[in-house]
């Protein structure tokens, strides 16, 4: 019941009428929530490897419809080309939210009797889109491990939204190789953090910094000591 209420509040917030639509499911606000919907679904759907059957049939059907509408717009097959491993769509954390959520939504849909045989707007199957993004993120881990980790380095904004997406893929992917690689990337990120800080205060370079009010005491006291992992 609460999940249905949550969906209706999303629709109302986006000024929709009636049911979920492509425009609402792919909206900026819903994108920020999609990792939670993915986690709920993968943990509790009827065939979950974690806690199967805790989602009732109506809630599961509702979430699958939301996933379908989301990927119908947000999964761009060409973007999953391995040439784009270091491309950034908007910003790093938005990039990760945008496409990793598509991967896990596609994983759900390819295993759903109702959606597994459907074609996305480009004419490709759900499984083809899933395979493309799954391959992309496995290579993402290798490339980031070889050439650098996060682009938004010690940013006050990016990592707190990027890392939960990596954790979702580490926890929820059905691909054992992807889970293992995401786990290793998380270890590398925290190892990098550990060697760059002393007693919780980090030094070194940063990226994506907004010095909108350098005289603000809150900004001054946060400098070097407020890594976003504490607020994840």
Residue ranges and their predicted role:
Residues 1-173:
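Aromatic-lined, polymer-binding surfaces characteristic
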